[in-house]
Regions:
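S-adenosyl-L-methionine
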Residues: 1-43, 51-58
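SAM cofactor-binding core of SAM-dependent methyltransferases
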Residues: 40-98, 102
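A short acidic, Gly/Pro-enriched loop at the edge of an enzyme's catalytic core
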Residues: 102-111
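A short beta-strand submotif of the Rossmann-like class I SAM-dependent methyltransferase core
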Residues: 114-115
């Protein structure tokens, strides 16, 4: 099923901008250094509307979760969920998972979730 385009996508994303990493390639090899206080970096591929993302981040405050979604109309719902719940240990990446090696160094990610 195709996601409907959201006419108010841009203002919704702007309200949740703190949860979005716009240049993840610049963090390659430095994720936990950039976001200290977390024991591990975990990755979710295809986070969609972010239900799993928000629940996982809430249940595991000691991990940092990077959630990748290439469809902004779905990702914005997840960004809103995380913002509403006040979760600080998750960030969203508006990227295609095919480019993972550009964003993460070998051995940097401890667990990958595929949804």
């Amino acid at each position: 099923m195709r996601m409907r385009k959201k006419p108010n996508l841009v203002p919704r994303m702007e309200r949740c901008a703190a949860t979005l990493i716009t240049d993840p390639e610049a963090l390659r090899g430095r994720w936990l250094e950039q976001f200290p206080g977390h024991q591990a970096l975990q990755l979710e591929l295809g986070c969609g509307k972010g239900r799993f993302t928000a629940d996982t981040a809430a249940q595991n405050p000691d991990i940092f979760l990077a959630a990748i979604e290439k469809v902004p109309d779905a990702m914005v719902v997840g960004m809103e969920r995380v913002t509403e719940r006040g979760l600080e240990n998750v960030r969203f990446l508006d990227r295609d998972a095919a480019n993972l090696l550009d964003m993460f160094a070998p051995g940097e990610v401890s667990r990958i979730y595929i949804n």
